[in-house]
Amino acid sequence: MRALIQRVLEAKVVVDGETTGEIQHGLLVFLGIGREDTLATGQKLIDKILKYRIFDDEQGKMGWNVSQANGGILLVSQFTLMAQTQKGLRPDFGPAMPPSDAKALYEQLVEYTRSQFENVQTGVFAADMKVHLINDGPVTFNLEVEA
């Protein structure tokens, strides 16, 4: 499972002209689910994201996690993160979990994240989403947990 996390000043997801999720200061998390991923894999990655210290502390160093920074999380599914890109000129999405299975796992991970953290917003699984954000830094990291 892979996550691309970005520290943002604000972010929102719009589907068909309607805002489906919006945060101010916090983390925009794009989540890619692979064929072999499980709920346990996802929980491990979510736990890492919640504890990952990429917010400035009182000394101006990256010492605080999203909770300590009083931020929010905008969680967006993105199967393209699982693409194989080493060969050729077209991404291969074979490593991504099939949509029906991925949707169920994504929904479980949303619920898990909400059980661990109060301010969680989401996109819409498999929708054509418009993601608006203002990067803070920019500060962007790729996180991965093997199944």
From Swiss-Prot:
The keyword Hydrolase applies. It is found in: Cytoplasm. GO terms for molecular function: D-tyrosyl-tRNA(Tyr) deacylase activity; Gly-tRNA(Ala) deacylase activity; Ser(Gly)-tRNA(Ala) hydrolase activity; tRNA binding. Signal peptide: none annotated. Belongs to the DTD family. It is an enzyme of class 3 (hydrolase). A motif (Gly-cisPro motif, important for rejection of L-amino acids) lies at residues 137-138. It comes from the Bacteria. This is D-aminoacyl-tRNA deacylase. GO terms for biological process: D-amino acid catabolic process. Pfam families: Tyr_Deacylase. It catalyses: glycyl-tRNA(Ala) + H2O = tRNA(Ala) + glycine + H(+); a D-aminoacyl-tRNA + H2O = a tRNA + a D-alpha-amino acid + H(+). Its EC number is 3.1.1.96. Keywords: Cytoplasm, Hydrolase, RNA-binding, tRNA-binding. Disulfide bonds: none annotated. The lineage of its organism: Bacteria, Pseudomonadati, Pseudomonadota, Gammaproteobacteria, Moraxellales. A Gly-cisPro motif from one monomer fits into the active site of the other monomer to allow specific chiral rejection of L-amino acids. CDD domains: Dtyr_deacylase.
